[in-house]
Amino acid sequence: MFKKRSQQSVIDEWQRYQAQQAIACANPILQRFYQMPLTDPEVPLSEVSFMALDFETTGLDPRYNEIVSFGLVPFTLRSIRPSDGYYQVVKPKCNLSEESIAFHRITHSQVATAPPLEQVLDELLERLSGCIVVVHYQHIERPFLDLACHKLWGEHCLFPLIDTMAIEARWERRGWKNQLKERLGIQPVSIRLDDSRQRYGLPTYSAHHAKVDAMATAELFLAQVVRHYSPTTAIGQLWE
């Protein structure tokens, strides 16, 4: 949505966008979502309510693929609350292959009885309201959710978030050592979720369950804050 620019410009853009959408949105669900005040970008991380979010999808392109499940886990710098989290299997319009069923750790019966996304989209947005969303790889959750809202309601749903993959890239793939590796043709360090967690001594979890991956993302972010930032870091400095 936004071209690469200074972090202050990113903050200013999001604040303007939120204010515009709160007025312009015709859909009452999206209107309520945008009327929830955006967290002040100067608020320290220690005072922020976060929501880790993960989508499991049939592919990587929201134009041609669908959401099959989503998981949310609320947390702060002091605690992660998986018992207050949420997990939902979604019935896609396409038929899932046997490989996809196994990959996403869901069953045929779960898919058969699951609601379509349009029946649970309002619940998802309600749970995200008032929180700073944290994901691992922003080019899945935000565009899939945006396109789903646009298909259903004809309006966009965009919001600032924190991307633990982007944070990892910032610290693990920059600097003169990484530039030298690139010139020598050396493969860059992996910033996938499990590989990133291993660098912080975090345990390995079974992947591709949306709530488990949301939990893993929350834990990774807390470890990144301890190593690279501070509880007093302003939340706006990490917005994507």
Identify the function of each model-found stretch.
Residues S230-E240:
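Mixed-charge, glycine-rich, non-catalytic linkers/tails in nucleic-acid processing enzymes
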Residues K4, W14-L152, H156-L158, L184-H208:
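Conserved non-catalytic scaffold segment of RNase H-like nuclease domains
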Residues F2-Q8:
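Intrinsically disordered, serine/threonine/proline
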Residues E219-V226:
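Short glycine/serine- and small hydrophobic-enriched flexible loop segments
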Residues E155-W176:
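Histidine/lysine/aspartate-rich catalytic loop segments that bind and position anionic ligands
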